[in-house]
């Protein structure tokens, strides 16, 4: 590594979000928008010459990102080379750099004794700089194999499959049942966490590279699978996980109780259809809101509700409160099961002084005017 003593000399410094009091008034991304490149170079120097980089092991990055390599390249101000290494393993680092929970940081060797390297921040800065500098462009395919492939579903898996198959020279057509391409990238992750302009930017690149996209088409209904088999040499099913985890209890079917997928999708679609003006039919405006579930989806629901202006908001967590640090039965390099406060909780605390209420027994009965369950 370029600076072998970096992890001894420098503390972890994480890039900050926009101020809470400002960001709760809009649906823009919570990120500040500008990267402190010199600070990120220093943070890259904290990456150790650890021998076995657990950050890209089974407990770390699931796509085997070459993390130590691009950390060191960033430290040496070789951003374009860092982008080249990042794109070796990651089709869409602008997505993962925003929404990935960063298991790589949980298994960082430095994390045994000190706060981990800011891998996620560095990844996002690399790809954002790549777009800003014009380094990321459509990669035209010069030779075609003559084979045709249908991809069913346009979420992250479908887009990645389409990208890989297209670069191999196959002609790819992606079918999406919704009115917009992107799957859960478009309709599952709130705008403030993943701006839809970021999603559209990548889709436009893929389209320019020769991938064809078909929306409003439900395979099995609008087109039979036998028809696809007749038209294509191969079919890839990447249909996603849009079915909600239910929480059966008395009054479950009462009006005003919604699964997170329905709630988040309605909000995002309303914003996209109405020029970023929320006309969500499930709006929490003026209501007493309970969000059941305190994980990533829960905090997305909290953040969405806060922007809609609820009368009150309470968050229930079904699990008992985890420890602040690792427990003995949760050793490194496993993902650290610890108490976390994310952007939505921070916003709710600012507005309502939110106290996360932990319960160990299942919810028995709904007796409220408005609830979103995010298990």
Positions of the model-derived regions?
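Gly-rich Lys/Arg/Thr-decorated short loops/hinges at beta-loop-alpha junctions or inter-strand turns
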Residues: 21-23, 180-187, 253
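Glycine-rich phosphate/pyrophosphate-binding loop
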Residues: 16-37, 270-273, 280, 369
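Iron-sulfur (Fe-S) cluster-binding segments and ferredoxin-like electron-carrier domains
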Residues: 5-29, 54-81, 103-128
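N-terminal Rossmann-like dinucleotide/flavin-binding domain of flavoprotein oxidoreductases
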Residues: 83-90, 122, 185-233, 337-360
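FAD-binding core/adjacent interface of flavoenzyme oxidoreductases
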Residues: 70, 93-152, 167-168, 199, ...
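Rossmann-like dinucleotide/flavin-binding elements
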Residues: 45, 151-175, 214-224, 229, ...
């Amino acid at each position: 590594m370029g600076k072998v003593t970096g992890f001894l000399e420098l503390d972890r410094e994480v890039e900050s979000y926009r101020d809470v009091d400002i960001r709760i008034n809009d649906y823009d991304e919570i990120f500040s928008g500008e990267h402190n490149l010199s600070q990120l170079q220093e943070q890259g120097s904290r990456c150790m010459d650890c021998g076995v980089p657990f950050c890209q092991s089974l407990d770390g990055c699931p796509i085997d990102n070459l993390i130590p390599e691009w950390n060191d390249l960033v430290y040496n101000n070789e951003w374009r080379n860092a982008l080249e290494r990042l794109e070796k393993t990651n089709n869409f680092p602008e997505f993962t750099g925003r929404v990935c929970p960063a298991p790589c940081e949980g298994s960082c060797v430095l994390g045994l004794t000190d706060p981990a390297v800011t891998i996620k921040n560095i990844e996002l800065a690399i790809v954002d700089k790549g777009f800003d500098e014009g380094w990321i462009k459509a990669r035209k395919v010069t030779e075609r194999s003559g084979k045709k492939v249908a991809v069913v579903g346009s979420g992250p898996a479908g887009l990645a499959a389409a990208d890989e198959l297209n670069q191999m020279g196959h002609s790819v057509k992606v079918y999406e049942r919704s009115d917009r391409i992107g799957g859960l990238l478009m309709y599952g992750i709130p705008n403030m966490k993943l701006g839809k302009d970021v999603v559209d930017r990548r889709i436009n690149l893929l389209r320019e590279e020769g991938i064809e996209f078909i929306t409003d088409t439900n395979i099995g209904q609008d087109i039979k699978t036998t028809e696809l088999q007749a038209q294509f040499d191969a079919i890839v099913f990447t249909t996603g996980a849009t079915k909600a985890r239910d929480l059966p209890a008395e009054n479950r079917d009462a009006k005003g109780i919604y699964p997170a997928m329905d709630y988040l999708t309605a909000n995002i679609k309303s914003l996209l259809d109405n020029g970023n003006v929320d006309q969500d039919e499930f709006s929490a405006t003026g209501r007493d809101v309970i969000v059941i579930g305190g994980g990533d989806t829960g905090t997305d629901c909290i953040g969405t509700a806060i922007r809609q202006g609820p009368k009150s908001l309470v968050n229930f967590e079904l699990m008992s409160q985890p420890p602040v640090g690792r427990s003995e039965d949760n050793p490194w390099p496993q993902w650290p099961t610890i108490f976390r406060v994310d952007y939505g909780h921070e916003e709710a605390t600012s507005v309502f002084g939110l106290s996360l209420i932990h319960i160990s027994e299942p919810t028995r009965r709904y007796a409220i005017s408005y609830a979103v369950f995010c298990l």
